[in-house]
């Protein structure tokens, strides 16, 4: 059913969902020590500064913290993010669009399903599933080529 839902519908569906089928909350995830040399990160930082990078990392963390490989992007998620960082909804929305522009989140899946995901997020999700000896459950529609 989730393959036909857009992000806002997933927000509603997942707000009362238990962790059944998810890989549970991961206490940590990998961040490359060369991340600040990554052109995507550098372009994001150049345009939005440390605040943009912080919000990007927060959104990645939220997806993985929930034991998932994507974060549904809807008004509720945007408002929670803005509230957490004590910034405006407009700033958060602009930064998310910037993350998509530089390729930190997959633009096609964002436009089609209103979700934030990337190969890195999905790779971390797969590692979590392996670590917990659980089968990963990435829907075909949202799966990115993860090596």
Question: What spans do the regions from the language model cover?
Answer:
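Single conserved hydrophobic/aromatic residue that forms the stacking wall/gate
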Residues: 1-14
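Long, low-complexity, charged/polar intrinsically disordered regions in eukaryotic proteins
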Residues: 13, 17-39
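Short clusters of hydrophobic/aromatic residues that line enzyme substrate/ligand-binding pockets
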Residues: 31, 71, 116
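Generic alpha-helical structural element
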Residues: 33, 44-48, 117
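Short amphipathic alpha-helical segments
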Residues: 38, 53-57
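Winged helix-turn-helix DNA-binding recognition segment
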Residues: 43-50, 58, 63-111
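Minor-groove-contacting beta-hairpin "wing" of winged helix-turn-helix DNA-binding domains
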Residues: 112-119
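Short, amphipathic alpha-helical interaction segments positioned at domain boundaries
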Residues: 119-147
């Amino acid at each position: 059913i989730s393959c036909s839902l857009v992000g806002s519908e997933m927000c509603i569906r997942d707000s009362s969902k238990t962790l059944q089928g998810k890989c549970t909350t991961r206490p940590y995830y990998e961040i490359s020590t060369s991340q600040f040399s990554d052109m995507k990160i550098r372009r994001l930082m150049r345009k939005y500064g440390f605040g943009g990078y912080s919000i990007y990392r927060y959104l990645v963390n939220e997806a993985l913290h929930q034991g998932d490989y994507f974060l549904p992007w809807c008004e509720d998620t945007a408002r929670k993010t803005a509230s957490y960082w004590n910034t405006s909804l407009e700033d958060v929305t602009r930064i998310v669009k910037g993350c998509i522009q530089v390729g930190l989140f997959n633009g096609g899946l964002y436009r089609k399903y209103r979700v934030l995901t990337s190969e890195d997020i999905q790779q971390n999700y797969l590692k979590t599933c392996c670590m917990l000896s659980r089968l990963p459950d990435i829907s075909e529609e949202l799966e990115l080529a993860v090596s």
